[in-house]
Amino acid sequence: MTGEQEWVQPSGVWATAVGVARVRALESEREDALFRDPLAQAFAAAGGLWPSSPPLPDDEAARRRRLAVAFSIVVRTKFLDDLLEHATASGVRQVVLLGAGMDSRAFRMAWPEGTRLFEVDTPAPLEFKASVLRQERAVAHCERITVAVDLREDWPSALAAAGHDAAIPTAWIGEGLLIYLPEDAVELLLARIGEQSASGSRMGLTLGSRGVIERFAAGAVPGSAASMWVSEMPDDPVGWLAGHGWEASCHTLRERAVAYGRPMSTLPQHEDGPGGLISAVRR
């Protein structure tokens, strides 16, 4: 990165993607990192969050909530990395990242030959991201296709126009996305995904856990990620997704953290983090 580069500063919901990049950059510096994201620091720096960031709040409860959110980002990233590896091992060669933000999986993961990865997001984050990628001379490890469209619009048509083939299996990722959408928008999104999913498609989602808005968003600073959360997971996420044509499994952040050798020992049970993790197969 050079000091001469002028970046369009992130704003609104997509600005939270830069905060996610900062968390991934910090994780990547650990000796026991659950993943390595060599581009995360560049994204965070371009967004003004590296090397400095907003200080932790003085309030102990708020501090724990901030740490819980960061922890959840690390765990969900590893979870979805594994899901994509399993999907491609099963023969899936199309990947769609919905609300892609600063996701760098096209660049940091190994992909089988012939994999096409579509990044769907609004123009502003995609343009910001493209500037950083050019600066870093980043080279994707698969065919990477960006689709500039708002998910509130007719994104399936835009995705099809970009080359997505609904007749063959797709791995769909909705990471840190649904929690920002009202329930009717979540239902529409799931219906549209289903319409574009051949049998054998995979899906990975993160959902806001029950009570997350009360626990995390109620006292959130305006403009912060938590201040924009509006939806939580249904009481029966597996049954809910079955109604959309998916055979799903639901995992807690604490459960996955233990499996990854990173137990959440410093957090009380009621402060596990803001969400649950879903893996699903289209039948």
UniProtKB/Swiss-Prot annotation:
Residues given in the record as S-adenosyl-L-methionine binding sites: 121, 150-151
Region (Disordered): 264-283
Pfam families hit by this protein: LCM
Stored Gene3D superfamilies: Vaccinia Virus protein VP39
Any one GO molecular-function label of the UniProt entry: methyltransferase activity
InterPro entries cross-referenced by the UniProt entry: Ppm1/Ppm2/Tcmp, SAM-dependent_MTases_sf, SAM_mthyl_Trfase_ML2640-like
Entry annotated with the keyword Methyltransferase: yes
Coiled-coil segments on the chain, per record: none
Any single GO BP term: methylation
Keyword set, alphabetical order: Methyltransferase, S-adenosyl-L-methionine, Transferase
Broad class of enzyme this protein falls into: transferase
Superkingdom as given in the UniProt entry: Bacteria
EC number, as in UniProt: 2.1.1.-
Sequence similarity: Belongs to the UPF0677 family.
Protein purpose: Exhibits S-adenosyl-L-methionine-dependent methyltransferase activity.
Entry protein name: Putative S-adenosyl-L-methionine-dependent methyltransferase SCO7813
Source organism of the structure: Streptomyces coelicolor (strain ATCC BAA-471 / A3(2) / M145)
Phylogenetic placement of the source organism: Bacteria, Bacillati, Actinomycetota, Actinomycetes, Kitasatosporales
